[in-house]
A protein has these predicted regions:
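Generic early N-terminus positional signal peaking at residue ~5-7
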Residues: 5-6, 56
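C-terminal segment of classical bacterial N-terminal signal peptides
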Residues: 20-28
Length: 345
């Protein structure tokens, strides 16, 4: 069986049977006999935050789940068996919550994920006193519950989420909804790992850009003959983090004064570079570079228009996460002397 054992199948079937009875007769029971109300007895108010003005109108059924902590019947939601590539966001405020690559079939009839977008989901004690509720960190919308120790995936975590609490942005529409930035600062493994921890960063991918070779391979780039740099593509939620904050962070996790190298990694492929997608990004990068020069730094960072971004081989993606280690080559250094409100903490 893929990604889950017989125990999870049996558990999921048990959960569905009890759920069906509960929907007709009262409280719902899900996992280990825990019960929770379906009648809205514990309302969940919207939290005031920067996104309050973007709250979307809800249908009565969505309000029952999102505001009043209700639960949709199993196998009824539109996303329980949905595996199209893309991003799942909060139905109420639109904040990015989950990546499609972290979705799996838990056999329970609700969308299940084994990881969330950094900082996007908040855990809190459920009113039943036993389980852990998960809510959108942006607006407080009820999502569902999180379970650990079920051994369904290597991460050993399952976010059990109501479809009614979610919306979906397909891969083809990501650029219409979210921001995209591309940075190069030496070995892309460490830069990738650093950006993955930034709240508001939805997804990172490592690859090659800035050169002339079509569909380059890692050995070709390492030879220094392609003109490409090892780079990181950052997909980010502009409701949470700004491009300016990401660029500041970039300048603080590598040494922008080194030319065509970072530490022991030497060559054009390890250069410091920002690849801007539009004039707004270009202006932000130029402004930050001037601030650093005003502080006496001899900035060597290349500023180039973004061309084709060639994804690196699969074994380079999420390198340190797959190893279960933290990079030793990346250390943040304060370079700007201030920390504005939209800065990465």
């Amino acid at each position: 069986m893929s990604r889950r054992g017989l125990g999870s199948v049996v558990g999921g079937l048990w959960c569905v049977i009890v759920m069906g009875v509960a929907l007709m007769n009262g409280p719902i029971s899900c996992r280990n006999g825990v019960t929770f109300p379906t009648d809205g007895s514990k309302d969940l108010p919207a939290e005031r935050n920067a996104m309050t003005n973007t709250m979307k109108p809800l249908t009565p059924e969505e309000e029952r789940v999102i505001v009043h902590r209700g639960t949709e019947p199993p196998f009824s939601g539109r996303f329980w068996n949905h595996f199209e590539p893309g991003i799942y966001g909060c139905r109420r405020c639109g904040r990015a919550l989950y990546r499609s690559e972290n979705k799996f079939d838990a056999g329970c009839g609700w969308p299940s994920f084994d990881a969330e977008v950094t900082g996007a989901v908040r855990r809190q004690p459920d009113p039943d006193g036993r389980r852990t509720e998960i809510v959108c960190a942006g607006c407080g919308a009820h999502l569902g519950h999180v379970f650990e120790g079920e051994r369904m995936t290597p991460r050993n975590v399952r976010h059990c989420v109501n479809s009614l609490s979610l919306e979906f942005v397909p891969e083809s529409a990501l650029d219409l909804r979210f921001g995209r930035a591309v940075f190069a600062g030496g070995c892309f493994w460490g830069v990738d790992a650093a950006f993955q921890k930034v709240p508001g960063v939805i997804r990172t991918r490592v690859g090659y850009t800035g050169g002339g070779t079509t569909n380059p391979t890692y050995p070709e780039v390492c030879r220094g003959t392609t003109g490409h740099a090892e780079a990181v593509e950052v997909l980010y939620d502009e409701q949470v983090v700004s491009y300016d904050a990401l660029a500041r962070f970039f300048f603080e996790i590598h040494d922008p004064t080194q030319y065509h190298r970072q530490g022991p990694d030497i060559g054009e492929q390890y250069r410091s570079a920002i690849f801007y997608a539009n004039e707004t990004q270009k202006a932000a990068a130029e402004r930050l570079m001037e601030q650093l020069r005003a502080k006496g730094l001899d900035v060597k960072t290349d500023l180039q228009p973004l061309g084709p971004f060639w994804l690196a081989e699969a074994y380079h993606q999420n390198y340190y996460e797959r190893l279960g280690k933290n990079p030793s080559c990346v250390r943040r250094v304060s370079r700007f002397g201030d920390r504005p409100n939209d800065s990465v903490p």
